[in-house]
Regions:
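Short helix-coil boundary/hinge micro-motifs
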Residues: 1-132
Length: 132
């Protein structure tokens, strides 16, 4: 990964790791997926490898990321979930066609419908957000 980009902040939960691709939201924001290729890199690190990403797909990913952040924040402060965030999360989950497979080692692995389907990867992230 190029040195000019900040390191990814990875955790054990896919959806919250995804929200960590933008940090310092209330200060000098640090964008960790500033380009489509950087989103491809992040997805690969998280087991959701795709061949490429368009600018429109990057924008959809950022919209999903901020929707997950808004829903998680509302949950943390025991507020109502923002309807627009719920809609984006649900839409991304519905549009994705990834399948969970069991590896010989007994682990879950995601199989995307094609290596070019960022929407499948976003569907996995959205489903993870729904589960938490």
């Amino acid at each position: 990964m190029p040195a000019e980009f900040p390191d990814f902040r990875l955790g054990n939960v896919l959806a919250t790791s995804f929200t960590a691709t933008l940090t310092e939201r209330h200060g000098d924001a640090v964008e960790r997926i500033p380009t489509p290729q950087r989103l491809v890199d992040w997805l690969a690190v998280n087991g959701l490898a795709v061949d490429s990403c368009t600018t429109a797909q990057l924008e959809l990913a950022r919209e999903l990321r901020e929707s997950i952040h808004a829903a998680a924040t509302a949950t943390a402060i025991q507020d109502a979930l923002p309807a627009s965030a719920v809609q984006v999360i649900n839409d991304c989950s519905i549009q994705g066609r990834a399948a969970a497979i069991l590896t010989p080692e007994g682990n879950r692995q995601w199989r995307l419908s094609s290596a070019s389907c960022v929407e499948d990867a976003l569907g996995v992230i959205a489903a993870d957000a729904i589960s938490i």
